From Swiss-Prot:
PROSITE patterns: ATP_P_PHORIBOSYLTR (PS01316). Keywords: Amino-acid biosynthesis, ATP-binding, Cytoplasm, Glycosyltransferase, Histidine biosynthesis, Magnesium, Metal-binding, Nucleotide-binding, Transferase. This is ATP phosphoribosyltransferase. HAMAP family: HisG_Long. GO terms for biological process: L-histidine biosynthetic process. The gene is hisG. One of its GO terms (molecular function) is ATP phosphoribosyltransferase activity. Its EC number is 2.4.2.17. Pathway: Amino-acid biosynthesis; L-histidine biosynthesis; L-histidine from 5-phospho-alpha-D-ribose 1-diphosphate: step 1/9. It is found in: Cytoplasm. Disulfide bonds: none annotated. One of its GO terms (cellular component) is cytoplasm. It comes from the Bacteria. Its cofactor is Mg(2+).
Length: 325
């Protein structure tokens, strides 16, 4: 029996809820046969898949080791904890939740410090005056070093933070911070501001693949099935299905609809009886319906699409190109 395909998802909180909802929308229902406290799960219909419930940081570490095939975790953790991340893991797709920015934040009282260039001047002057480097509180050590090096900021030292990083300047353990934020409200409440060019990374939850995992033929086929579900759901979300029938429809009219409303005709032009099926961006539905009625359609129906399966699967093609041949 072949080894299981391991999908790692967050083990608690909103990230777990959002991850499970994302897969459910794609027709992949995650469940825990052992109960809510079980840290192993399954996907209905995919018997060889084992779902591992881990913390977001553990997921990144397991992706680096190759002990999981797919994992759901933030890009910030991937970039911070995996050396040469682009060679070892693949960010297959952003999942549309878990948004947050990794930022450089300084005290609001530093009214003349707005950019990284300003920060360079201040850190240099601080060292000359106090004979020590400015302290940066953060848990993003590698991201901070890389970003500061890009901006030629060298007169600083990192103070590793295990939590409540935004409070470090107020209690005197650091002069500034690098931290993750969604709205900036917590930073502002602690008297901090984000530098104008201080957004280091715009992160969100991603579906990530490990190059180091055991990519047997069975594992690749399982990945193809999972990504086919996800791609079909994503494709369906871009369109509504529009159906009508009228004798006045011809190639010229269809070409005009394509160019004006961004529609696609997945099954070709109208049938001999004039039946036409189009996929239309939601924002163009009313305009398309008016256009079709102006040209002879009596009735135009609109329906939501659950899935649109296509011969090509761009997500799996992306994965296949990344994995060892």
């Amino acid at each position: 029996m072949s080894a299981p395909f391991v999908l790692a998802v967050p083990s608690k909180g909103r990230l777990q809820e959002n991850a499970e909802a994302f897969f459910a929308r794609a027709g992949l229902t995650l469940s825990k046969p052992g109960g809510a406290r079980d840290y192993r799960g399954t996907i209905a219909g995919l018997d060889n898949v084992e779902v591992a419930y881990l913390s977001a940081s553990e997921i990144a570490a397991n992706l680096a080791r190759g002990s999981v095939h797919f994992g759901v975790t933030g890009e910030d953790l991937v970039r911070e904890s995996i050396t040469d991340a682009d060679k070892r893991v693949l960010l297959i797709d952003g999942l549309g939740f878990g948004y947050a920015n990794v930022v450089v934040a300084v005290p609001q009282a530093w009214i003349d410090v707005r950019t990284m260039a300003d920060l360079d001047d201040v850190t240099t002057g601080f060292r000359a005056q106090h004979n020590r480097r400015m302290r940066v509180a953060t848990k993003y050590i590698n991201l901070t070093r890389g970003f500061f090096a890009q901006h030629n900021v060298v007169d600083y030292r990192i103070v590793e933070s295990a939590g409540a990083t935004e409070g470090a300047p107020a209690v005197g353990t650091a002069e500034m911070i690098v931290d993750i934020t969604t709205t900036g409200a917590t930073l502002a409440a602690n008297g901090l501001k984000v530098l104008d060019d201080g957004v280091m990374l715009r992160s969100q939850a991603n579906l990530v693949a490990s190059r180091e995992a055991d990519w047997s033929d069975t594992a690749r086929e399982t990945a193809r099935v999972i990504l086919d579900h996800i791609a079909s759901r994503a494709r369906a979300g871009k369109y509504k299905e529009v159906r009508t029938r009228f004798k006045g429809c011809n190639d010229a009219l269809l070409a005009e609809a394509h160019s004006r409303f961004g529609v696609v005709s997945p099954f070709g032009g109208p049938t001999s009886s004039g039946m036409l099926t189009l996929h239309c961006p939601p924002a163009q539905i009313y305009a398309l319906g008016s256009f079709l009625r102006q040209h002879g359609a009596d009735t135009v129906s609109v329906a939501a699409l659950d899935y649109v399966f296509d011969k090509e699967n761009p997500l799996f093609s992306k994965l296949a190109a990344f994995l060892p041949q």
